[in-house]
A protein has these predicted regions:
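Polyanion-binding surfaces on beta-sheet-dominated domains and ring/shell assemblies
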Residues: 1-105, 110-199
Length: 199
């Protein structure tokens, strides 16, 4: 019995390591919980540094249907999701490519709020063929995969962080992006009527 060899499967070992890492991260998040007002202040500070940064926080797409009618789709960009995730804190976000069948590439993102133990998984598919059916080159597939992963990241982060909390600061950022805010510093402070020492 002393010389008995115990076989440990690699997959099981990796799962155990991942579980241990998550447990440590959750314990740390519980020990150092986020300050929501401080997080929102950070979002405002990062997003409203200047008009160009504020503009990067949003995307606008113009689409035309079969009847020739055009419509405008707008929303928060990947950059804004990165700012929100970094300022919010105590988040665990992972992205990966989970599928490539030669026609479509599928990216997955998982966002886990370590404080609330609420997690969301989002998948994004992107075509990797031309209109004529020719498959993209390897380099273009990598580029498309990275873009899909970024979009999945954005969707997962925005699904986890409550929109009701970030809505007001997002509106302030939009005003700066549109050039309608009188003063970036004033707009940032007015989000919560804070004093200069609190900003």
């Amino acid at each position: 019995m002393d010389n008995e060899i115990i076989e440990v499967k690699q997959a099981e070992m990796l799962q155990a390591i991942n579980r241990a890492e998550v447990d440590i991260q959750i314990a740390t998040a519980k020990q150092y919980p986020r300050d929501i007002n401080a997080s929102l202040n950070k979002i405002a500070t990062y997003a409203m540094m200047d008009k160009e940064t504020a503009e990067d926080c949003f995307y606008v797409l113009r689409r035309q249907d079969a009847n020739g009618n055009s419509s405008v789709i707008e929303g928060l960009s990947v950059r804004m999701a990165e700012i929100i995730a970094g300022a919010w804190g105590n988040l665990r976000v992972q992205t990966r490519i989970i599928g490539n069948d030669g026609r479509m590439i599928t990216a997955q993102a998982i966002c886990h709020d370590l404080e609330t133990n609420f997690a969301v998984s989002k998948e994004v598919k992107r075509r990797i063929t031309t209109k004529s059916g020719k498959t993209y080159s390897e380099d273009m597939q990598v580029v498309t995969g990275n873009a899909a992963a970024s979009i999945a990241f954005r969707n997962a982060v925005l699904a986890v962080i409550p929109k009701a909390i970030t809505k007001r600061v997002i509106n302030e950022v939009k005003q700066v992006a549109l050039g309608q805010a009188i003063d970036v510093e004033t707009a940032r402070k007015n989000v919560w009527q804070t004093s200069p020492k609190q900003v």
